[in-house]
């Protein structure tokens, strides 16, 4: 069971109470981690957590089963860049930026690092934050 599924269960059972307010009306896009989504077919649980924050989900064109890897699953996090036009995490970050989010959420620590680096590369770190979805919920627990 992934932590987003556990959090969804706890909220549904009333064992975890979330206060709204902090993220009310914020535009949040969710980056699907490769192993969570494509390998384990978990797409809905993370998205079903956002209504408890009263946030607005804005989907990237490539999401769920069609989502692009941020590069961490391909070990880009641990090696030097290869020749090419663009880093894969920057390309994925650009896809996220197209939907004008306030926040990019994910559910993988490696994706979090890659997307954070992409936001920094695009010099948007003062406008857009990257969080694990559990962090967003934690900030709003009663």
PLM regions: where:
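Iron-sulfur cluster-binding electron-transfer modules in prokaryotic oxidoreductases
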Residues: 1-142
């Amino acid at each position: 069971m992934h932590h987003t599924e556990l959090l969804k269960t706890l909220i549904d059972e009333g064992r975890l109470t979330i206060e709204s307010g902090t993220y009310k009306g914020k535009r949040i896009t969710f980056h699907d981690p490769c192993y969570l989504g494509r390998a384990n077919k978990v797409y809905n649980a993370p998205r079903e957590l956002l209504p408890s924050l009263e946030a607005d989900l804005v989907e990237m064109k490539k999401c769920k089963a069609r989502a692009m890897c941020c590069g961490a699953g391909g070990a880009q996090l641990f090696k030097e860049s290869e020749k090419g036009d663009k880093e894969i995490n920057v390309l994925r970050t650009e896809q996220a930026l197209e939907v004008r989010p306030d926040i990019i959420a994910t559910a993988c620590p490696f994706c979090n690092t890659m997307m954070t680096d992409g936001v920094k590369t695009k010099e948007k770190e003062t406008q857009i934050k990257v969080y694990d979805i559990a962090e967003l919920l934690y900030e709003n627990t009663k």
